[in-house]
Structures are given as structure tokens and as C-alpha cells.
Curated annotation (Swiss-Prot):
SMART domains: GIYc (SM00465), HhH1 (SM00278). The UvrABC repair system catalyzes the recognition and processing of DNA lesions. UvrC both incises the 5' and 3' sides of the lesion. The N-terminal half is responsible for the 3' incision and the C-terminal half is responsible for the 5' incision. This is UvrABC system protein C. Residues 16-94 form the GIY-YIG domain. Interacts with UvrB in an incision complex. Belongs to the UvrC family. GO terms for molecular function: DNA binding; excinuclease ABC activity. It comes from Salmonella schwarzengrund (strain CVM19633). Residues 204-239 form the UVR domain. It is found in: Cytoplasm. Keywords: Cytoplasm, DNA damage, DNA excision, DNA repair, Excision nuclease, SOS response.
Length: 610
């Protein structure tokens, strides 16, 4: 128990009503957030002589102050608890590190509706299908839909300004509603309805209607039309036969859990209208000594109750763990959704099969993650030995990206003992320097990054400067001038110069701007971790630079592809029906655009994919 915090006096003031409590350390930082049906009873349990775990002992030893917020109901307390966890990110809570919104397929409400991927708030008029686990799953589905139901996917700006059909029409991927006379309103509306039914899981209705149309076309001796519909029927059947589908038209999330070596993996399977839309693995941050029950309960609460991720609640949630607060969670989710949400932990039949699949995926993902972590640990240990450091707990790496001095962006990526810490990656827009002056850009980003107070835990052990002697000299000069309240001599500054022809494995490392550098063997684990963080920094900088260019010039990512100038860009968008159509096109289809060679088509294809 803390010597400073008077627990006995505090507990006398605590009510027995439901509510939320926040625990603070000596620095005024929230270190734990919890909820309780009975605040007095719950808080008293922290100050018994026989505490439940070492984690609780470590937590209680740091408490200097506790704030209590009383709520009307336990459901209210649960919602408030997860809002506070998201706000404060306390180190003794299990934390779900997932701030991305989930993508949907959007069917617009236009006269001739279009299909597109959508993230974020649902303001536009139309229908939304999903959620999908990631953008790749959406793009894959859109490409498939375009082959079966050829309705447009081009942007409205392209659609409204066409006088003749694009290449998508020529290859049978679009009915061409942009040009009068190519498709009847009735036929286009019918295809849109098929898409709507298909995305709603009503494949049987689609097939029934298509078969009826095929038979009618045959009776009317319209054999070409009948053959076209026959091909469409076969395409729908091929897709539905490949899918893991429940006949019940289920709308549910299936959550499997694996826990080993202090690390947890929670795998979520997204099922809508009986179709598996995809899945995703999560690795919540788990404080040492945390029990599996707390991991699962906290994850599920944060996953659904922190609403900024635009999460869509299913009608049912299947769980691979028997929660102690299952009824409370179901009530809270039902209140949030405005309809009844069921939480099941012992399903049967197809649902048990779903749960087994989620559990298997969680275990597989955890094994892979632990293997990767072991590799990272070995590499960091090897690098620490090379640099003569006791250990490396945190590394930061910087890179600069620009085109002919324009839209300069600096990136900072962070690795900890587990590898990339993507939540702490940062980009810096560089301004007020001579265009193309990489030294000035590095000087500016380092001053912005380190010329302020930094928490002890976030002071890096190693700072990698991508660029060799000149950039390292800038870093040394900046750190010599820093006047900050933290130990500026703690980080080891290391310059990394690319090898001849920029080949991996030939990098030269510099401790000082003067003198000769040194190289590591190409198979050195220490070199591999340097290459990893350097490449991450490079990719992060280029990504930021491309976004900045696209924003400034209001153009697509086509502008960043070498060999694609304004005329070719215009031709590509014109023939493919917009950027979405181009993204979904194959190399062969891109190569059919006038002025695009096979080699350039491959470059465009891979640039848009990656």
C-alpha cells in the first residue's frame, strides 16, 4: 500500500452506488480506470492485505489519489469507463490500439447509382453494406461485383462529363449509363437491384430472378440475351459456392481469443446476412499479470463502446469466453444500438463452427506474432551489442521526402522492444527552408521533435538519421544546442548511409560526421533491424509526401508514378471511367489504353496496389 495515500480515510467518503473510479500516481497521471456496481465494496478490495495479483500490488503501490464519478446505473458506468480509458490510456488497463474506421461498400442514391468504398460518417444519400475488416476486402469485393453486375464505379465528376463510353464499357465491366442509348433505364435499375440483393445476402432471390429472365429470353428466341444471363447465373453460383455461408442470414460478430506468454490475440470474424465479409486480428496492450478474463471483458467493451470508430453493431455477438458481466454488456450494447443485442458464449451448430474458426485464427495469429516478436528481440539485442548499449527499449528514425524541393515532408517512426509502434509514428510538414535543402529539413524536424519536454519512457535509446555524414552532422548540431529538461545525452545518434547503387546490405553506419564509418555483414541481425526501421521511415515519409502533393494539386496518386504525365493521366482516367475503375483494372486492361506500354501498365498497376 502507498505510504502517501490514506486509503482508510478515503474509503470512509466513498458511496455504495454504481460508478467509475480513476486512480492517479504521484505525477498526476491516470494509471487505472475501473467501474463498479458498488464503488465502496470494489475500492475496498484494493486495500486488503491479500491482493489478487502482482499487477494489483504494483498498481496500489503507486496510487496517490482516486477520483470517483457516481452514475445512475451500472450500464452508465460501463459506458463512462470505456470513454475514460480511451481518453486517458492508463498503463494498467488493457488497451485496444485501433483507431481506424471500418470501410463499407456504398451504393449511391444517384439516378444511375454507383458502387464505391466508403469510410467515416454516413452523410451521403444511399445504402451502406458492411462493415468490412479492411480496404483490401472492399476493393476485392468491388472488383468481383463489377464482373458480375456491371454497374458503374466511376466518380460522379467523370460520369457527368462523358460523351462516349470508357474502356470499362468496352470490356463488359459497365453498362455505360453515362451515354444515352447504351442501356435502358429498366435494365440498369434491374442490375442495381441484383447488387442490392446480393450484398444483402439474398443470393437465392438473385438466381431465381435471373433464371426466370433467361427462360423468358429463350422463349422469345433472344438467344444472345439468354446466353449473357446464363453467364451471369454461373458467375453468381461460382461466388456463392466458394463462400462459408450460413443459411440463417446471420448478422453477427464472432470473437475468438488466444493468450500465451503475456500476449493476447483477439480475432473478430465479421458476418453479415450470412456471409463472412472478412476477419481481423487485434493485439491489445496487456499489462503484466493480467488475467484472460479481464483481457476479454475490456477488449469487448472498448471494441463496441468507444463509438468514434464508426463500429456497426450486429444483432448477435459470439464469444469464446464466459464473461462475468455478459448481461450488463448485452444491456449496454442494446441501449447504444436502440435494439436488442444478444451475447452468446455457448453456441451450437453453425455458430459453434464460426467460433471454432475464430479461435483457430486467433491462435495462428498469436503464434506468428510471438515468432516475430522473438525475432525483433534477437535483432535488438544484437544491435545493442554492436552499439555497446545495455539494451535498446526505444528507437526513432527520421527520413525526408520531397519532389524537386516541393511539398517536403519529414517522417519519424518509432520501434520499441516489440517492433514498430505505429500509433506513435509522426509526419512533419517542413516549411520556411530553401527548396530541396535536406539538411535544413532535418534540422527543423529534430528541433520540433526534441526541443520540448519528453516523458522519461519516451526518450529514445537510439536515433537513426537516414542520410549519412551530412545529416548526422545536422543532428549533432541540433542536440548540442538543445536546452531541455530531459537528458539529451542519452540517445545515441547514428547515421545510416545507403550502399552503392542503394543495395540493401551495403549500408555504412556513422557514429560521428568525421572519419570512416563501419559496415555490418549482410546477414547480421543488427543490420536487419536497422534496415527495417529505415525502410519504415522511408515509406512513411513518401506516403506523407504523396498525400501532401495530392492535396495541394488536387490530383490522384497517378501523379507520383514516373512516366505518367498529364496527358497519359487524362487518358487513363477517361478510358477506365475514373480512378476507382483504374484501381480495379488488370495489367492487361491498363495496357489497352492508348499510349500505355505493357511495362508502364505494370508500373501503374503495382503503384496503385501498393
Amino acid at each position: 500500500m502507498s505510504e502517501i495515500f490514506d486509503a482508510k480515510a478515503f474509503l470512509k467518503t466513498v458511496t455504495s452506488q454504481p460508478g467509475v473510479y480513476r486512480m492517479y500516481d504521484a505525477g498526476g497521471t491516470v494509471i487505472y480506470v475501473g467501474k463498479a456496481k458498488d464503488l465502496k465494496k470494489r475500492l475496498s478490495s484494493y486495500f486488503r492485505s491479500n491482493l489478487a495479483s502482482r499487477k494489483t500490488e504494483a498498481l496500489v503501490a503507486q496510487i496517490q489519489h482516486i477520483d470517483v464519478t457516481v452514475t445512475h446505473t451500472e450500464t452508465e458506468a460501463l459506458l463512462l469507463e470505456h470513454n475514460y480509458i480511451k481518453l486517458y490510456q492508463p498503463r494498467y488497463n488493457v488497451l485496444l490500439r485501433d483507431d481506424k474506421s471500418y470501410p463499407f461498400i456504398f451504393l449511391s442514391g444517384d439516378t444511375h447509382p454507383r458502387l464505391a468504398m466508403h469510410r467515416g460518417a454516413k452523410h451521403a444519400k444511399g445504402e451502406y453494406f458492411g462493415p468490412f475488416p479492411n480496404g483490401y476486402a472492399v476493393r476485392e469485393t468491388l472488383a468481383l461485383l463489377q464482373k458480375i453486375f456491371p454497374i458503374r464505379q466511376c466518380e460522379n465528376s467523370v460520369y457527368r462529363n462523358r460523351s462516349r463510353p470508357c474502356l470499362q464499357y468496352q470490356i463488359g465491366r459497365c453498362l455505360g449509363p453515362c451515354v444515352a442509348g447504351l442501356v435502358s433505364e429498366e435494365e440498369y435499375t434491374q442490375q442495381v437491384e441484383y447488387v442490392r440483393l446480393f450484398l444483402s445476402g439474398k443470393d437465392d432471390q438473385v438466381l431465381t430472378q435471373l433464371i426466370a429472365r433467361m427462360e423468358k429470353a429463350s422463349q422469345d428466341l433472344a438467344f444472345e440475351e439468354a446466353a449473357r444471363i446464363r453467364d451471369q447465373i454461373q458467375a453468381v453460383r461460382r461466388v456463392t459456392e466458394r463462400q462459408f455461408v450460413s443459411n440463417a442470414g446471420d448478422d453477427l460478430d464472432v470473437i475468438g481469443v488466444a493468450f500465451d506468454a503475456g500476449m493476447a490475440c483477439v480475432h473478430v470474424l465479421f458476418i453479415r446476412q450470412g456471409k463472412v465479409l472478412g476477419s481481423r486480428s487485434y493485439f491489445p496492450k496487456v499489462p503484466g499479470g493480467t488475467e484472460l478474463g479481464e483481457v476479454v471483458e475490456t477488449f469487448v467493451g472498448q471494441f463496441y463502446l468507444q463509438g468514434s470508430q464508426m463500429r456497426t453493431l450486429p444483432g448477435e455477438i459470439l464469444l469464446d469466453f464466459n464473461l462475468s458481466d455478459k448481461t450488463l454488456l448485452a444491456d449496454s450494447l442494446s441501449e447504444l444500438a436502440g435494439r436488442r443485442i444478444h451475447v452468446q458464449t455457448k453456441p451450437r451448430g453453425d455458430r459453434a463452427r464460426y467460433l471454432k474458426l475464430a479461435r483457430t485464427n486467433a491462435a495462428t495469429a498469436l503464434i506468428t506474432k510471438l515468432s516475430q516478436q522473438s525475432t525483433i528481440t534477437q535483432r535488438l539485442t544484437a544491435l545493442a551489442a554492436v552499439l555497446k548499449l545495455p539494451a535498446i527499449k526505444r528507437m526513432e528514425c527520421f527520413d525526408i521526402s520531397h519532389t524537386m524541393g516541393e511539398q517536403t515532408v519529414a517522417s519519424c517512426v518509432v520501434f520499441d522492444a516489440n517492433g514498430p509502434l505505429r500509433a506513435e509514428y509522426r509526419r512533419y510538414n517542413i516549411a520556411g527552408i530553401t527548396p530541396g535543402d535536406d539538411y535544413a529539413a532535418m534540422n527543423q524536424v529534430l528541433r520540433r521533435r526534441y526541443g520540448k519536454a519528453i516523458e522519461e519512457s519516451k526518450i529514445p535509446d537510439v536515433i537513426l538519421i537516414d542520410g549519412g555524414k551530412g545529416q548526422l552532422a545536422q543532428a549533432k548540431a541540433v542536440f548540442a544546442e538543445l536546452d531541455v529538461p530531459w537528458d539529451k545525452h542519452r540517445p545515441l545518434l547514428l547515421g545510416v548511409a545507403k550502399g552503392a547503387d542503394r543495395k540493401a546490405g551495403l549500408e555504412t553506419l556513422f557514429f560521428e560526421p568525421e572519419g570512416e564509418g563501419f559496415s555490418l555483414p549482410p546477414d547480421s541481425p543488427a543490420l536487419h533491424v536497422i534496415q527495417h526501421i529505415r525502410d519504415e521511415s522511408h515509406d512513411h515519409a513518401i506516403g506523407g509526401h504523396r498525400k501532401k502533393r495530392a492535396k495541394v494539386k488536387n490530383t490522384s496518386t497517378l501523379e507520383t508514378i514516373e512516366g505518367v504525365g498529364p496527358k497519359r493521366r487524362q487518358m487513363l482516367l477517361k478510358y477506365m471511367g475514373g480512378l476507382q475503375g483504374l484501381r480495379n483494372a488488370s495489367v492487361e486492361e491498363i495496357a489497352k489504353v492508348p499510349g500505355i506500354s505493357q511495362g508502364l501498365a505494370e508500373k501503374i498497376f503495382w503503384s496503385l496496389k501498393h
